[in-house]
Amino acid sequence: MNADIDLFSYLNPEKQDLSALAPKDLSREQAVIELERLAKLISHYDHLYHDKDNPAVPDSEYDALVLRNRRIEQFFPDLIRPDSPSKKVGSRPNSRLPKIAHRAAMLSLDNGFLDQDVEDFLGRVRRFFNLKENQAVICTVEPKIDGLSCSLRYEKGILTQAVTRGDGVIGEDVTPNVRVIDDIPKTLKGDNWPEIIEIRGEVYMAKSDFAALNARQTEENKKLFANPRNAAAGSLRQLDPNITARRSLRFLAHGWGEATSLPADTQYGMMKVIESYGLSVSNLLARADDIGQMLDFYQKIEAERADLDFDIDGVVYKLDQLDWQQRFGFSARAPRFALAHKFPAEKAQTTLLDIEIQVGRTGVLTPVAKLEPVTVGGVVVSSATLHNSDEIERLGVRPGDRVLVQRAGDVIPQIVENLTPDVDRPIWRFPHRCPVCDSVARREEGEVAWRCTGGLICPAQRVERLCHFVSRTAFEIEGLGKSHIESFFADKLIETPADIFRLFQKRQLLIEREGWGELSVDNLISAIDKRRKVPFDRFLFALGIRHVGAVTARDLAKSYQTWDNFKAAIDEAAHLRTILQPSSEESEEKYQKRVDKELISFFHIPNMGGKIIRSLLDFFAETHNSDVVSDLLQEVQIEPLYFELASSPLSGKIIVFTGSLQKITRDEAKRQAENLGAKVASSVSKKTNLVVAGEAAGSKLSKAKELDISIIDEDRWHRIVENDGQDSIKI
């Protein structure tokens, strides 16, 4: 059973919410139901933790469940179950797999679901490299195996470390477990391997091995695994390598990370080299030089999917030439030179029980379909996204309808069809008032979302902002989950982010709360204290500013490096916006475009447009927000974010490219400059530090000479790039 399952609905079909009742207030019948729920829920969490090393809840929440079970048993000793958690020997250990930072980011892949997505991918390649329509674009094609991504580090041919993908930046150290996987060599074959190479691929479990494992689980009266992927993930992340060794895991290589050298100049060639080292590579790996061959491969693999002895969820295309890969580069989350062409999602029929409205941290009202539980692609689904009011109207769904549910991309459940549109039922109306604070909900022009206008008077928004603040990609405070924040907020223990860091002052009050004790409270306070120092990008993301996601926050942190620099820029931009007054002949739209253009030029951060900048300035212009941030800064210390590129002499410098570049495109040159920490401007000004002049450079070159700005040609620029920004030129 999946961690996302609504276990309460299964164990308590009448949906009596007994969790809020104190043990002494339960009737005998209620105690029976509650003890069954707790026994199965705790067993479920034990399974995720011990068998999969994948804890679904913080320690404090787990401890609260165990304590509640024990207290109910004290009031009803004759109802103690044979499978009671109180009968289990030992307690939940605190150990965790060590965390390791990837030396080269372990990124995801961009997904495509339609043939058109593949055409668009090839179109982007052709435009970037100025290729003709009929010019071949050679790609490798291979099945996308559904396993757990892992990076194997070999130094002088010897396996020294194995790390899971994690969040792409930091993964889990699973070296002891990987050493017991039979088809992962401890020493590479041959002698032509690089001094250091990280070989990346998927740890997986074959379908036949999965069936055998579940057969053993049945014989031993143990819980069955839901699917091979979950079994592989749990087996690899065991704390005891002996358990991993019994699980018949396999490894299939599909790429590499850090490498001191590459013995081939194509993706296909590199995979054959990796295969010669003794690692498994897909025997279906092939090359294709046009979209017809790529789609033929996709259709062939999809047709054979059921007969393969391992799960796959699509096909991966990669540019074959490694120099093309390097030039095409990476986005913040994925390589641009690759595309995962996913198979159609699996579908199932069920009944729509209700439509609930959730209020997000920015006030967006999101409809969520509550479903009669149904298995889709090996996972039990009881909720699905309905996106927005337009989607509900398009589908015409109402509570009681039979609907078709799919896991889009095999991940997010969504309703794709109403199977009973002609049945006479009342139309479901989207609410125009917030279901939490009753404020008016409005839909802004050009947007599909309805938003609560209550702002920070809306408890739901305040709670969601606090949840966002402590989330994994923000402050990442372990043990402070949504249920705790909701409870603490309701009792006015926390109302702002700074209050979280003052919870130690309320230690005794916390200890006296039901489900808490000295150990749980002290663990929480310790976890909070560990986050009093936070990287600049995480701090900025944690503020929950609309349109400022993790990538934008990181771009801002990379550009300004310190909070003081950033805040000074915000203040200066706010002043600039104030003095940019509209002219009498200027429409509101033209005025806004002019302001946006000035502000975009002022910040000069790639991919940061007027919408993001306006949101930033509006946030800090709000007195309440500034007060919340100032209060928070009394409790935490923001660590400057100095990227590895910050050591480049070009870091923070403003560069202008002019004229026609012969060896690379303008976009490539811009990306090279940004990778060295520089900013690229479109016009020459006193702030410009360097001008790179190609052939037929015109007025920009003349202006650079007038302002006595350093000027170099394209060849000199390439030498600078090759030397990571090092050059004798005065900038």
UniProtKB/Swiss-Prot annotation:
Domain BRCT stretches: 645-731
Domain of life from the UniProt record: Bacteria
Assigned EC number: 6.5.1.2
SMART domains to which the protein is assigned, alphabetical: BRCT, LIGANc
Keyword annotations: DNA damage, DNA repair, DNA replication, Ligase, Magnesium, Manganese, Metal-binding, NAD, Zinc
Requisite cofactors: Mg(2+); Mn(2+)
GO cellular component assignments: cytosol
Record GO biological process: DNA repair; DNA replication
Keyword Zinc assigned: yes
Entry's family note: Belongs to the NAD-dependent DNA ligase family. LigA subfamily.
HAMAP family, A to Z: DNA_ligase_A
Function: DNA ligase that catalyzes the formation of phosphodiester linkages between 5'-phosphoryl and 3'-hydroxyl groups in double-stranded DNA using NAD as a coenzyme and as the energy source for the reaction. It is essential for DNA replication and repair of damaged DNA.
PANTHER family for the chain: CHROMOSOME TRANSMISSION FIDELITY FACTOR 18, DNA LIGASE
The protein, known as: DNA ligase
